[in-house]
């Protein structure tokens, strides 16, 4: 896995709780639709679209853009895969589209503006690289009018019995 991913990601909730994710450099994730290369070992299937593997990505023939880093939530160890999207929430009364130019200056773009809130947006690094999006999270958090920045993380689904 390339070393340009942060070793740790911290996400603070509105209530001040912090969730920490630690990079698992011995793992990587990619589409589970792509046939496995010799020597690849599936550690876990996240869903129908993604699987986590235990072989260093550099030893495969796949392009770097096809693999994603794997993090572990602390202290549970639950796998988490950053998608490269960031949820950015601006202060009440600030429309996300008003901040488009400022977001673009830090190397990101507004990717999706959900209809249920004008003050929030899904943002992605203009390069399309997950590492660039993760690096931009701290910069975005420091922008005027930004209240919250959180990387989108894919997590294993948890099924509960209805008993």
Question: What are these model-derived regions, one by one?
Answer:
Residues 1-163:
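Primarily auto-inhibitory N-terminal propeptides
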């Amino acid at each position: 896995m390339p070393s340009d991913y942060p070793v740790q990601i911290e996400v603070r909730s509105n209530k001040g709780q912090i969730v920490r994710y630690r990079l698992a450099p011995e793992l990587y994730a990619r589409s589970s639709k792509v046939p496995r290369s010799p020597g690849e070992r599936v550690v876990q299937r996240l869903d129908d679209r993604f699987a986590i593997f235990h072989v260093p990505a550099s030893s495969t023939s796949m392009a770097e853009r096809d693999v994603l880093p794997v993090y572990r939530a602390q202290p549970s160890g639950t796998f988490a895969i950053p998608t490269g999207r960031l949820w950015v929430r601006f202060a009440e009364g600030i429309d996300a589209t008003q901040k488009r130019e400022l977001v673009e200056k830090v190397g990101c773009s507004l990717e999706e503006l959900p209809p249920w809130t004008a003050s929030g947006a899904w943002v992605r690094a203009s390069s399309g690289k997950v590492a660039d999006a993760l690096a931009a999270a701290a910069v975005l958090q420091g922008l005027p009018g930004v209240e919250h920045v959180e990387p989108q993380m894919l997590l294993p689904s948890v099924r509960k019995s209805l008993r």
